[in-house]
Amino acid sequence: METKKEEEKKLELVTTHICTATDIGVFGNMFGGKMMSIIDLSSGAYASQVCDTPRMVTVKIDEMVFKNPVKVGNIIKLYATVKEFGNTSVTLYIEVRKHNVYTGKQEVVVHTTIKFVRIDDEGNPIPISTRVKKRYEERVSKHGKGLLSSEELVEEKNSKP
């Protein structure tokens, strides 16, 4: 099991969101349910990319502690990394940061872990292939991240014998 600092080194930007008036709760901060929705949808997309399948469902979200408020006009960035693979599941470490466009500094707003399970057409859990797990780990080892840009994918493909 990796430490939080080791996980942070492998974080990949998944999405950016600007907080609008429709995201705000009654006390002037981003509504917690909106943040949870952003986390669930974005990490589901990340899990699907990592596992090469759109058929990933959320089965567990660990504790979420909201550390800093998000106001209208704030930009938040969601980062993710694979914490571990199971037979049919992938657990992600998620960190959402508020980004200051003037200074470039970021502060953590919330972090959590979220688990997704791969399912078949009937909704039954099915294994995540060993190839997917191995490829992800090789990419992290080589590139420091598991998902690659289009250019990196072409380079990776061309470098194979």
PLM ranges: what are they?
Residues E8-K10, M30, G44-Y79, K83-F85, ...:
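Hydrophobic beta-strand-centered segment that forms part of the acyl-chain substrate-binding groove
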